[in-house]
Amino acid sequence: MIWYRWALSLMQLRTVILIDGYFKAGMVDAALTLFKEMSGVAAKPGTLIHAIVLDGLFKDGRTVAAKEMFHEMIKSGVRFSIGTYSVILGGLSKNGCADEAVMLFDKLRAMNLKFDIRTLTIIIDAMFKVGRIEQAQNMFAAIPAKGLVPTVITYTTMTSNLIEKGLVEEADNIFSSMERSGCAPNSRMLNIIIRKLLKKGEIVRAINYMTRVDGKSMSLEASTISLLISLFSTKGIYHKQKDLLPERYQFLEGDIRS
C-alpha cells in the first residue's frame, strides 16, 4: 500500500509540473484537460495545483471560469492557503473585479486569517482601484503592527497609486520613508514613478526621480524614453520645458527637435 501511495504521489507531481508548464506556454486548454483527468483519480488535486490552475485562468482572462472553480473548491471542501487566496484576490483585481476582491478580503479578515505582505500589497492596490484611498493608506500604515515589512513592490503600489490619484506629495513622503527604512528602490519602481508623474504634468518631480536613476547607475526603460520623446518633442505638450531635462538625457535632443 505504501508503494502505491508513493507511485501516486510521483504521478501527481509529474502532472502538476506538466499543468504548470502548459499554462506558462499558453496552452490553457491542454492544462485544463490534464487537470480534469487528474481530478478523476483516487487522490484529488491539492491546494498547490488548484492555485496553479486558478492563476492560469486569471492570467488568460478567463475570470468567469476562475470564479466558478473557486466556488466549486469551497463546495468540495478544498483547504485554502494564504497563497491561494493571494492568487484569487490578485486575479480578481487585475481582471476588472477589484470590488469583488475587496469584499472577499473583508470576509477573510473577519475570519481572523493572518495575511502575508504579498496579499496585503494586492489588496491595497485593489482598494485604490475602487476608490477606498484612506482605507488603503491605513492598511499600509498598519503593516508594521502586523509584524510584516513592506517590500519594493508594496512601496511601488503605494506611490504609483497615490500619484495616479493626484496625491503626489503623499507619494513623495512614502518614497522618503522607504529610503529611511533601508529599502532601496529598484529600476522598475523609479521608471513607474517617472512615467506616472510625467503623465500628471509633474515635470519637476519627474526630473527629480530621473536624477535618482542617474545616481544609482540605472537606466530608463524604453517605455519611459518613448514617453519623454512624445511629451518633449516639437509637437509635445512640454516642448518648451525640454531644457529642464538632465544632461544625461540630452541624447534625446535629436528626437525631441525632429
Predicted features and spans:
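Hydrophobic packing position at a conserved site in alpha-helical tandem repeat units
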Residues: 2-7, 21, 31-42, 56, ...
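Short, conserved recognition motifs on repeat-domain binding surfaces
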Residues: 130, 143, 158-163, 174, ...
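Pentatricopeptide repeat
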Residues: 11-16, 20, 31, 46-51, ...
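Short amphipathic alpha-helix initiation/capping segments at coil-to-helix junctions
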Residues: 164-167, 182-187, 196-206, 217-222, ...
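Eukaryotic acidic, Ser/Thr-rich intrinsically disordered low-complexity regions
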Residues: 221-258
